Amino acid sequence: MPQGLSRSEAQRRLKKWFEKLDILSWWDRKLEELSKGMQQKVQFVITVVHEPKLLIFDEPFSGFAPVNARLLKNEMLELRDKGHTIIYSTHNMESVEEVCDYFAIIDKSRVALSGKVDEVRRKFREGIYDVSYEGNVSLQDCERYKVISSGFQGNETYFKVSKINGTSNSQLAGELAKHGELMYFAEKLPSMNDIFVKTVGE
């Protein structure tokens, strides 16, 4: 029985979570009869059912199929948006990027890097931009940028370019616009996985 809840209230909340996680049909089953993924869902429900202000998870997405991992991420984001504080440990840096506001990378029992996710990603920016044009377009290196990669799909040409130091965003966009109609122009910030590797290695 979840602490501080009457039996009827506990059952009401549990059934609500079982419905949300699509496991209500397993309501009367014993835990040992469930698959590992189902057991993890039940463990998640038990953790959140009494609505604690602080939630702590250890590798919450480990072992889940992508669809179920996404389902749990969405539930964690909803809890966060309702004012719950969530702390979790993970080696899945993609989930850090999607879920976390703040993070800390711990290496050899010390904090190697910490801060707001968005701020740290901007701090590690490398001046890389994703660009696309309508139609078949050719780009060559120039004083404003270097071409890293290119591709063509449908009726669009895609490029990844590196901005030369001293070039402003407006100067870069202006130079790129000389070559055709820009469909997309945006800075590509490094992923949290990239930052993790740069901070502590593979």
Language-model region placement:
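Short, charged/small-residue-rich alpha-helical element at the C-terminal edge
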Residues: 129-202
